[in-house]
Amino acid sequence: MSSQSHPDGLSGRDQPVELLNPARVNHMPSTVDVATALPLQVAPSAVPMDLRLDHQFSLPVAEPALREQQLQQELLALKQKQQIQRQILIAEFQRQHEQLSRQHEAQLHEHIKQQQEMLAMKHQQELLEHQRKLERHRQEQELEKQHREQKLQQLKNKEKGKESAVASTEVKMKLQEFVLNKKKALAHRNLNHCISSDPRYWYGKTQHSSLDQSSPPQSGVSTSYNHPVLGMYDAKDDFPLRKTASEPNLKLRSRLKQKVAERRSSPLLRRKDGPVVTALKKRPLDVTDSACSSAPGSGPSSPNNSSGSVSAENGIAPAVPSIPAETSLAHRLVAREGSAAPLPLYTSPSLPNITLGLPATGPSAGTAGQQDAERLTLPALQQRLSLFPGTHLTPYLSTSPLERDGGAAHSPLLQHMVLLEQPPAQAPLVTGLGALPLHAQSLVGADRVSPSIHKLRQHRPLGRTQSAPLPQNAQALQHLVIQQQHQQFLEKHKQQFQQQQLQMNKIIPKPSEPARQPESHPEETEEELREHQALLDEPYLDRLPGQKEAHAQAGVQVKQEPIESDEEEAEPPREVEPGQRQPSEQELLFRQQALLLEQQRIHQLRNYQASMEAAGIPVSFGGHRPLSRAQSSPASATFPVSVQEPPTKPRFTTGLVYDTLMLKHQCTCGSSSSHPEHAGRIQSIWSRLQETGLRGKCECIRGRKATLEELQTVHSEAHTLLYGTNPLNRQKLDSKKLLGSLASVFVRLPCGGVGVDSDTIWNEVHSAGAARLAVGCVVELVFKVATGELKNGFAVVRPPGHHAEESTPMGFCYFNSVAVAAKLLQQRLSVSKILIVDWDVHHGNGTQQAFYSDPSVLYMSLHRYDDGNFFPGSGAPDEVGTGPGVGFNVNMAFTGGLDPPMGDAEYLAAFRTVVMPIASEFAPDVVLVSSGFDAVEGHPTPLGGYNLSARCFGYLTKQLMGLAGGRIVLALEGGHDLTAICDASEACVSALLGNELDPLPEKVLQQRPNANAVRSMEKVMEIHSKYWRCLQRTTSTAGRSLIEAQTCENEEAETVTAMASLSVGVKPAEKRPDEEPMEEEPPL
């Protein structure tokens, strides 16, 4: 049938009838199923019969229009009904909402009212409690007042026969106040060592007699005890006390005896039972210890030269002639063993103080064994000290009170302080120049100082500062003081050398170039001292040849010899005019003074080293490179300079560079757990190389700090000045050259430190020096390899550098070490082709930026890219360079995330198909490797996530060694798992030394790279095949394993060899000898 019927018997075109109202349909006649009544066979050509009943009972024509109108009316009625119901619901909701709001507001008012009532009740209770307390206090005061009045009344009304020796409450309070003031005065006198300059004191001293009960013992007068002038009494002054009749006179008599003994003017009339030590104990004030320059006899303004009689009549005992006025450190300690209030220990971490050696209050029982051990070590120290000529330390160390009463925690400190004291007679003095001090603060005792300089300046008493650390145990505190002494000695020695050089430049300036003062870096003190020690250790006359002739021909002739010239003849001697005689004599005097100064500095160095070794701490200034005198030095301006012996040539092997100064670059928070890039990285690598013996097989070279000019070959001037200077030398720079204040550049990190971002921490004191040192170490190593002094090299440096851009530090990096080294190779050695391979798991965006348009530097990076979703987001395969550098920037960017992570098979395949073919076609002169090891297994996902083995990097290094004649330098970049980076560094150094590497596992050799790696390699080869022809034949081998690729290469090599052995050319016919005639054929 052409039309399908619906289950209800209606055709498809009549379906709208179903929209009728069901009530209306009920009135319609029901349909009759007549399907069974139809004949079974219907002719095909017959018209289909319509069996609907509505055709049989057809309605009028106007019925559909009416039906439609009724339907619309019903719809409108329904809508109106729904609208009414909706309004009713909304009204009900608003009514309930208002009702609930009123209830809530009422509850709030009720709650607030209750709270206010509670607060009012509480306040009322507090007021009542306060009133009760006030009333109770008033009642107590009234009772106390009544009680006192009753007592006073009883005292007034007492009978004469009763005893009255009991002192009243007022008298007891006065006595207690007097005793406390006296104790405070005694303690204050022990600290100040200075006689009061109050005018009331001088007036009172002359008015009061020795029998006055109101005057305290005058062995030492305190500034806090003021003697009032008659008629001038204040509320704070102490009134003289009336002695009662019942007070015993024994105490008064003892005081009188003491005062009479102290006021005797002549020491011959002193009592036999008053020894000298007693006076010293009772009166710690000494002539040299006092800071006052006037005697009490004539007031504060008179000089300190009054006689003993004047002192006696003023109540101050003079110095005893049998005791030296200039007491030593140990003698002052012995004199103060009975002091009532010992001085507090001052342990400043920055400057050693002589008060460190003062004894403690007394030894404890727990330190008896330690004191015995210290007593046993004293004779050994005395024997070692006996080697010093002219020393006075033996009686100090053998003093029994010092051993007996010295505190256990401070006795080693005192021994160390005494050991460091060197007599002035040891250093040769130059007339008119004075001696150079050995330490920043003198530790020499008063009995060893010349009388002309024994007077001390006035000072305030020392006490513990709020920032000073608490006293530690003996060993830790001694070690701290020794470190501080060593650092101060180095600082002082450096300052002396700079002052001497400045003085020499002033005396004999060179007209061709101005004098230049070197930059001063606090962290370079020990480094510069090592450099200058070579200059100090050489004999002065050996460094200045021709000086003996100058001594012989002082004012007559000066022989001029050529500098570093063996072929040219020396100029003939010329006579010096009489007018030039005086300058020659001045130069001769200056040379003699300079000779003595340098000898004195050498002597001080040796004495210091010997004293530190005597204290049990060996001090060595390390090795140094031989220094030649610069042409701008004062000596070279006037004297001939001898040709220095050439330095020892390093072994032609692998070079290593490392410096402990780079360890100081750390966050100020002091914790390395929250900072992956920490000092333990390079320290662990250096220890591993030493433990395995690889360090001994290599040549360790000395690094240096890169100059600001070298850094500016890659970075901007503002960036270099901001991150390449410390606070000391930054003040000398022009503020206009800096981009802005440091506060706008650095941020506060969550750990409490400071940094550029959450990764790149900044230490204001040490970060600039460490970053410059890392660049300088890489530059030194690269130049030694490029010039052929070393075979290859590995730089153990930090902070890394391949993320540092021209003006932006990021990713732990401040200066791009490898990029600076490459730029300097181009500028100074004219190296035409440089290959930089970066196998850090992060893309080296800074290195790419530096050489993006340079065709002489081929930059190849193997890194995790993940379509730009991995830090730093750069390094896409289509970043090929710009301008003339197109094609010389190759990014082997791995995509696909960590499903699965890349491993040895993927990196070996990338080297085989992309890196080595392009590098071989480029044919570099030097190979530099940004050797980051964060792709080694063991790193978390944010820092790498790949699963390369450490030995794989050894094989990658071995492949790169086949380029550039083996001139390759690896510089440490990333890598934060200590075990991983130590294993990888060991493998790379072993490969550089040419050692046999551990074989790769068979599984790695047979493993094919995963699909993500194959797609990444094919994309790179597709992009760069237009620039490098070698990639056209390696595209098909990207998905093969290492064994399959080697087998295929061997087969191709055999095929090429076989084809080369076959030749289709015809060999030329051999010529017959001319003398051999051709045989004629016989005639037929």
Swiss-Prot record:
* Reactions performed catalytically: N(6)-acetyl-L-lysyl-[histone] + H2O = L-lysyl-[histone] + acetate
Q: Where is the composition biased (Basic and acidic residues)?
A: 133-163, 259-274, 516-531
Q: What is this protein called?
A: Histone deacetylase 4
Q: Which GO terms describe its cellular component?
A: chromatin; cytoplasm; cytosol; histone deacetylase complex; nuclear speck; nucleoplasm; nucleus; transcription repressor complex
Tell me what organism the protein belongs to: Homo sapiens
The record's gene field reads HDAC4
| BP term (GO), one | positive regulation of protein sumoylation
Summarize the impact of E247G. In NEDCHF; decreased interaction with YWHAB
Q: Where is this region: Histone deacetylase?
A: 655-1084
**Chain positions of motif Nuclear export signal:** 1051-1084
User: Crosslink site(s) for Glycyl lysine isopeptide (Lys-Gly) (interchain with G-Cter in SUMO)?
Assistant: K559
The parts of the chain that form a coiled coil are 67-177
Phenotype upon changing S348A: No effect on interaction with ANKRA2
What this chain does, per the entry, is described as:
Responsible for the deacetylation of lysine residues on the N-terminal part of the core histones (H2A, H2B, H3 and H4). Histone deacetylation gives a tag for epigenetic repression and plays an important role in transcriptional regulation, cell cycle progression and developmental events. Histone deacetylases act via the formation of large multiprotein complexes. Involved in muscle maturation via its interaction with the myocyte enhancer factors such as MEF2A, MEF2C and MEF2D. Involved in the MTA1-mediated epigenetic regulation of ESR1 expression in breast cancer.
The organism's taxonomy opens as: Eukaryota, Metazoa, Chordata, Craniata, Vertebrata
